[in-house]
Amino acid sequence: MSWSLFKTKCNVLTGPQHISTELFAQTITSGYHQAVSLHFDSMSAGGKIVNNAPKLPILYNQFLAQCKANLAQHNEIHILNQMGPMILNYWAGIIIQGPTGTSSVLNPGTWTGIPVVQNFDFQIILNAMITCFRTHIMTLQGQYVSSVLPGVTSSWAGPMLQSLP
């Protein structure tokens, strides 16, 4: 799934005026999970993430709790900054396995949230969210272990993890 398909999936949130908090959290987190699940690692010859399935319910519950807490706020909310620790937690310990080896995420990277001015255009928020997601993936760091040449290891970084446009 590309980030444009993530955006298409999330456009369901632009329909009815009163989307439930649960549907909002479920749509964003499952869309993110699907988007990163379909990334492939160029260093391991097309490796896929193999251990992120248990991370989706955790991500959903964290995001849902934050959204519910935000409903009680009367101050300005920066949801993209609030997502940072959740996304970093999602990436901690991720393993990517491919035909030529395994890449392990040892450093879940850094998160940079973009402040979005309050508006009524969900596309602005979605575009900012995708920018944060894509920028974060570039900061991932880890180690690659070759299965073709035993004992060969190399440092690994997020730019090796690629997606469709």
Labelled PLM ranges:
Residues 1-165:
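Amphipathic alpha-helical hairpins/coiled-coils and adjacent low-complexity
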